[in-house]
């Protein structure tokens, strides 16, 4: 059957892929113009015109295109101006940014583009590097690559219409033949990453094989890490001269903006106290904006994000059209998405309630909305808390794995939770409902160990590539509070209660046998992953949150 060559129209008029720094965490009221006409007719027109002129200068500086007559057989793609106000950690506007974006969704795979994959650094990698900054008292600086995607070379022959408002006088009929990649093209991100990799490896940096956005350079007893997140570059170095030397080399190839010491990255505030040997990651300003958006800032602060005994189920979903219509007015999905970003970045203490609330996105009820507001009231009390790392005598990765039993009232499935610690703070965590119905607490705990074990292997492989944590050569220790699960992980014996366990979970035994991990028993009172699987008493929750490194700013900074 012949494949259709018809190009599907986008669902929305501005269905473009755009990488702007605040897109992940800026949840304030949308005031940015959505069209060229809105920008030039609005109260900030002079700012937006200046921003567009800066963008056009970047296009000229990078030799992104040349004006030509459109060849026969080619159809030019359109382009659109995208406007964004960049904000600081307090939400104040610091820059007006205009980005020229190609309508890449109209291009055909295999004709106009081929490979599109580009790596993206994980939050786990970022937190591990932050723990190392605290441990080794590293210099931590930040740089921004201006118009990063324009640095990528383009192999395909692509023509684009001239930008709105900037058509060349007397040559309005001509089109732009693209020499470089441009925002909006399917291959733009990949081409930028390839160019960046080519540049930094020529400077002697080695790419981490597990997270391809992390680079290491060792020069004698000195070392430096580079962390790339789209167009943001973090530099963590044991030597200030090596750091400045690297900055100079990068600035020779790319148009860079030196932001000095890192203090605000991807909506995360970085606070250091070098005399105390501590580093804290905070989302205070972000949480403030979340609370204001959902009108929670004046509510009574809560002690815990979910109370022990709280049950959230499908029984609390709307029962009729009247209730369903009422819930359509509630911004439930937006609230859960906002909480999810805080949870993923710096707040493992809300991982369990956010995971549970996310199960009802399709049809939430009023009880679910009340539970979501309870999480926000807890954040109201703890918004100035930080995920903290500190200098320790023995730097090693320690894991904790836990599970409840049949905690989901709808399908009787259990919830797994794990947290890995390094330098006194959590570097990796997860709370997730299991995909099977466990027949015993041992099986539920062993399945949870499987999730923790696979993450331990990832952490071990990644950290091995950093070459600064000697203890990673030893098996990663994972604590479990179920003796039967610990025994089962170390023995090949089966019983009537374990013979039906899926073979993939039995790979835990192989990891133990090969010396990649070791699973040891710990008392339930010391299981800090407990709040990732169920609601617990306030005193217990507070103790475990502190053990995960969730501390007040006063405790971190003094």
Task: Indicate where each model-derived feature is located.
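Chromodomain-type histone methyl-lysine reader module
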Residues: 1-198, 202-209, 214, 556
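Mobile genetic element proteins and their domesticated derivatives, centered on retroelements
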Residues: 6, 36, 52-55, 59, ...
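Catalytic palm subdomain of template-directed nucleic-acid polymerases
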Residues: 86-87, 150-162, 186-187, 217-254, ...
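RNase H-like nuclease fold core
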Residues: 99, 103-105, 339, 400-441
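C-terminal reverse transcriptase regions that engage the nucleic-acid substrate
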Residues: 124, 130, 182, 187, ...
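Catalytic palm active-site di-aspartate
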Residues: 144-147, 177-185, 207-237, 250, ...
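Active-site palm subdomain of RNA-directed nucleic acid polymerases
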Residues: 195-230, 234, 243, 253-262, ...
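RNase H-like nuclease module associated with reverse transcription
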Residues: 264, 269, 396, 426, ...
């Amino acid at each position: 059957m012949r494949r259709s060559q018809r190009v599907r129209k986008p669902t929305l008029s501005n269905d473009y892929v755009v990488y702007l720094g605040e897109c992940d965490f800026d949840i304030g009221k949308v005031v940015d113009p959505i069209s060229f006409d809105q920008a030039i007719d609005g109260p900030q027109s002079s700012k937006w015109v200046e921003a567009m002129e800066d963008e056009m200068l970047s296009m000229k500086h990078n030799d992104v295109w040349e004006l030509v007559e459109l060849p026969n057989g080619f159809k030019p793609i359109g382009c659109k101006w995208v406007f964004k106000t960049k904000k600081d950690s307090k939400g104040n506007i610091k820059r007006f940014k205009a980005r020229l974006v190609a309508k890449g969704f109209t291009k055909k795979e295999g004709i106009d583009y081929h490979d599109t994959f580009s790596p993206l650094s994980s939050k786990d990698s970022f937190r591990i590097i932050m723990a190392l900054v605290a441990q080794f008292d590293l210099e931590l600086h930040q740089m921004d690559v201006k118009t990063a995607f324009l640095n990528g070379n383009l192999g395909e022959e692509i023509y684009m219409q001239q930008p709105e408002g900037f058509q060349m006088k007397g040559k309005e009929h001509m089109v732009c033949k693209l020499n470089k990649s441009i925002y909006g093209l399917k291959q733009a991100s990949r081409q930028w990453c390839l160019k960046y990799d080519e540049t930094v490896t020529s400077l002697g940096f080695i790419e981490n094989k597990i997270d391809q956005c992390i680079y290491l350079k060792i020069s004698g007893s000195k070392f430096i890490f580079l962390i790339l997140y789209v167009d943001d570059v973090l530099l963590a170095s044991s030597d200030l001269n090596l750091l400045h030397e690297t900055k100079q080399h990068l600035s020779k190839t790319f148009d860079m903006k030196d932001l000095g010491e890192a203090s605000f990255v991807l909506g995360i505030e970085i606070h250091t106290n070098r005399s105390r040997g501590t580093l804290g990651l905070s989302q205070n300003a972000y949480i403030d904006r979340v609370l204001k958006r959902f009108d929670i800032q004046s509510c009574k602060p809560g002690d815990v994000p979910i109370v022990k005994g709280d049950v959230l189920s499908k029984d609390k979903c709307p029962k009729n059209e009247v209730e369903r219509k009422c819930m359509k007015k509630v911004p439930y999905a937006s609230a859960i998405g906002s909480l999810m970003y805080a949870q993923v970045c710096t707040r493992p203490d809300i991982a369990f309630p956010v995971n549970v609330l996310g199960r009802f996105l399709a049809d939430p009820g009023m009880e679910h909305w009340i539970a979501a507001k309870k999480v926000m009231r807890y954040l109201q009390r703890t918004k100035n808390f930080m995920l903290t790392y500190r200098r320790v005598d023995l730097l090693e990765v320690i894991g904790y794995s836990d599970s409840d039993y049949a905690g989901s009232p709808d399908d009787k499935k259990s919830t797994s939770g794990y947290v890995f610690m390094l330098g006194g703070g959590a570097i990796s965590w997860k709370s997730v409902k299991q995909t099977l119905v466990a027949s015993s607490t041992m099986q539920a705990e062993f399945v949870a160990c499987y999730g923790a074990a696979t993450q331990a292997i990832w952490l071990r492989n990644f950290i091995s590539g950093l070459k600064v944590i000697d203890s990673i050569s030893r098996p990663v220790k994972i604590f479990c509070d179920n003796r039967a699960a610990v025994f089962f992980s170390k023995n090949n014996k089966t019983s009537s209660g374990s013979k039906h366990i899926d073979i993939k979970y039995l790979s835990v035994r192989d990891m133990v046998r090969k010396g990649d991990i070791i699973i040891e028993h710990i008392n339930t009172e010391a299981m800090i992953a407990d709040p990732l699987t169920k609601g617990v008493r306030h005193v217990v929750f507070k103790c475990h949150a502190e053990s995960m490194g969730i501390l007040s700013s006063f405790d971190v900074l003094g």
